[in-house]
């Protein structure tokens, strides 16, 4: 794991991190905003899943969540939407499949099942990495998303929350 970019915003730190993903068998990136409260202890975290054709960078660069996250003492993480790279199978003629379109599910068919395992990545591999390396609370987290990311957030909530009716707000 390597922090490849870092800047200060609203008294917190915005990080861009890359690491090797065993789920997707490639390098992945995510952005993580740590509020000032994280300097003195663990803070709650919100997972934001971006939509179709996006990456970790879209909401990091265009959305302004940092001021409110800083005020509330909440970390904010944005994983990439799919595996990327020259050796990753892709549907180059169809923007709805492949890079930028992982749909936060695990592929079941060759050749995609070797790399497109975004559900396992965002629900297992990435959380373990984040909880082991950053001052965030595993017991206090939320998830949301936009478009394809909303789908990913919804299926995650439905599969991992015992009383999803109280958790889902549409």
Language model regions located:
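N-terminal cap/lid segment of alpha/beta-hydrolase-fold proteins
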Residues: 2-37
């Amino acid at each position: 794991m390597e922090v490849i970019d870092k800047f200060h915003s609203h008294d917190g730190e915005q990080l861009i991190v890359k690491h090797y993903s065993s789920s997707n068998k490639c390098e992945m990136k995510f952005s993580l905003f740590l509020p000032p409260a994280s300097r003195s202890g663990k803070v709650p975290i919100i997972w934001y899943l971006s939509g179709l054709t996006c990456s970790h960078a879209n909401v990091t660069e265009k959305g302004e969540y940092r001021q409110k996250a800083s005020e509330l003492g909440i970390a904010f993480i944005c994983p990439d939407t799919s595996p990327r790279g020259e050796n990753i199978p892709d549907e180059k003629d169809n923007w709805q499949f492949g890079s930028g379109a992982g749909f936060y599910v695990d592929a079941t068919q060759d050749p995609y099942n070797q790399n497109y395992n975004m559900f396992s990545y965002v629900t297992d591999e990435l959380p373990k990495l984040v909880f082991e390396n950053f001052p965030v609370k595993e017991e206090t987290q939320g998830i949301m998303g936009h478009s394809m990311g909303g789908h990913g957030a919804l299926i995650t909530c439905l599969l991992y929350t015992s009383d999803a009716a109280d958790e889902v707000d549409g």
